[in-house]
């Protein structure tokens, strides 16, 4: 199987699994919104803001470190060095995961009562502490399988973890001991801990099986310096991640406090916070499943190109990734602008959720493009620049939340989110464009997609109004309308020349590799020698 096809196949597996996981997760958030209401979701979101800081400390950058070092060693066909890196990563995860568990368990009363100002969060934090060691091991296994392009294994583990979490949560919420907001938070924490533990056990078993299979035919090569290289990648990422996670935790703690200082009641402040973070943002992040799957695979792919010094392959892959991301994000942004109220009503039976979704629709192109740019920077060994930008962005967000929320309320926070993404993206994209010479075409990447999206939404809205006897903006009809708009959007892009023939041929060639062989343009009257410069150029063109 060709390299590009393998990359696309792994990305498709990741995309489908990520789509399934986000769909299940969004359905579960809908269930929680109806079960424990917005203020209950807000309380658990506060718990998760502190837990995310503990998760950052438990992982300590080991996922990316494992992916980079293992991918580089497999690219050099040095299997013993890859296994040495894996063993070092497991020891690293055991240390930081155990330390994070002890710290979170012991500091839970202080964090819950002093930081979150709510004693109901303490039992949930203590229970979540036991999920940190298995989570750290799962990060190592995930990084290893990502480096080996075994996307389906990470997909299976993700689906298993999500299904276990939801099954435990639903079962516990039905018991009388877990009624009320504190009981609901405790049930969700227990479900997350059980899911992480079960998933880690399966990950380790599969990892052992994988290592035994490789040992049969692996040559013995030098593996010195692997642990030092792993620490060189992981520790700086960990240190910067600590700072950013701490700033994000402070930001999330300040949001309900700022809303209360603006005049809102405590329950109303938790409800507004829960609506934005527990309802609206999952909807915005749901389409990102398609891109995040390929973004995860960009890291090892670009890492191998970077080690070999193949600048042309890096430029082509980055250019195509940016193009597809912008096209997709503009379509999703238009969907949210047009159907925000309907989505809020159908999913959550909440008009306020629809209004927040409309206000944050402009966040979609910024967030999606920033996500793919960050992945490319990590693959090109520019992760420190990316983390530096994230820290600056998080610090500015904390200051803005502290200063603006008490005066302007929740509207200020929505604008802070948009401004934060714009600032972060401008720094990250400028860094990427300095490292990789990508040709930017504003008409093809910005103007035409926006016009085609507006045209597609206008046409489908006009047609649906003529067929209002058969269609409405409720239930499945709403999603049919959204699907028709998206299909028409890409059709208009093709008609306007935004999507070119070469793009269509490239996509079809991924599914039908024989198609390129039958094309007479790909054949040469006189085949060049296999070692010649012309042959290498031809092979490189066919691969991309």
Name each model feature, range by range.
Residues 21, 29, 60-67, 127-146, ...:
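Short runs within selected transmembrane alpha-helices of multi-pass transporters and secretion channels
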């Amino acid at each position: 199987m060709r390299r590009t096809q393998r990359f696309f196949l792994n990305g498709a597996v990741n995309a489908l699994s990520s789509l399934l996981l986000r769909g299940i997760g969004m359905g579960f958030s809908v269930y929680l919104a109806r079960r424990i209401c917005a203020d209950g979701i807000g309380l658990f979101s506060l718990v998760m803001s502190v837990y995310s800081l503990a998760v950052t400390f438990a992982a300590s950058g080991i996922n990316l470190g494992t992916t980079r070092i293992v991918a580089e060693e497999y690219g050099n066909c040095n299997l013993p060095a890859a296994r040495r890196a894996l063993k070092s990563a497991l020891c690293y995860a055991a240390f930081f995961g155990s330390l994070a568990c002890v710290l979170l368990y012991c500091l839970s009363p202080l964090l819950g009562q002093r930081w979150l100002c709510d004693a109901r969060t303490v039992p949930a934090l203590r229970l979540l502490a036991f999920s940190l060691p298995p989570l750290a091991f799962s990060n190592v296994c995930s990084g290893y399988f990502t480096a080996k392009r075994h996307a389906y294994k990470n997909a299976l583990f993700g689906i298993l973890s999500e299904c276990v979490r939801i099954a435990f949560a639903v079962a516990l919420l039905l018991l009388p001991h877990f009624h009320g907001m504190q009981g609901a938070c405790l049930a969700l924490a227990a479900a997350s801990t059980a899911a992480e533990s079960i998933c880690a056990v399966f990950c380790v078993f599969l990892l052992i099986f994988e290592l035994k299979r490789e040992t049969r035919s692996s040559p013995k090569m030098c593996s010195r310096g692997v642990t030092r290289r792993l620490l060189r990648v992981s520790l700086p990422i960990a240190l910067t991640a600590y700072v950013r996670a701490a700033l994000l935790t402070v930001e999330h703690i300040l949001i309900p406090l700022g809303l209360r200082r603006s005049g809102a009641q405590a329950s109303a402040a938790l409800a507004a916070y829960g609506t934005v973070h527990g309802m609206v943002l999952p909807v915005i992040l749901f389409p990102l499943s398609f891109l995040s799957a390929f973004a995860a695979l960009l890291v090892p792919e670009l890492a191998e190109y970077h080690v070999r010094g193949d600048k042309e392959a890096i430029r082509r892959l980055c250019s195509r990734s940016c193009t597809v991301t912008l096209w997709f994000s503009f379509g999703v942004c238009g969907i949210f602008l047009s159907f925000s109220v309907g989505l809020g009503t159908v999913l959550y039976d909440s008009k306020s959720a629809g209004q927040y979704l409309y206000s944050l629709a402009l966040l979609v192109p910024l967030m999606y493009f920033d996500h793919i740019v960050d992945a490319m920077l990590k693959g090109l060994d520019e992760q420190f620049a990316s983390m530096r930008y994230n820290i600056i962005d998080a610090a500015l967000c904390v200051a803005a939340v502290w200063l603006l929320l008490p005066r302007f309320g929740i509207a200020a926070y929505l604008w802070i989110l948009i401004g934060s993404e714009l600032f972060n993206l401008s720094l990250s994209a400028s860094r990427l464009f300095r490292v990789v010479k990508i040709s930017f075409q504003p008409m093809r990447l910005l103007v035409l997609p926006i016009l085609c999206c507006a045209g597609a939404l206008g046409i489908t809205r006009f047609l649906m109004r003529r067929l209002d006897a058969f269609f409405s903006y409720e239930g499945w009809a709403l999603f049919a309308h959204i699907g028709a708009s998206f299909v028409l959007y890409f059709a208009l892009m093709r008609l306007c020349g935004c999507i070119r023939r070469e793009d269509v041929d490239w996509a079809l060639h991924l599914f039908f590799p024989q198609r390129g062989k039958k094309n007479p343009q790909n054949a040469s009257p006189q085949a060049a020698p296999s070692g010649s410069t012309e042959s290498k150029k031809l092979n490189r063109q066919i691969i991309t």
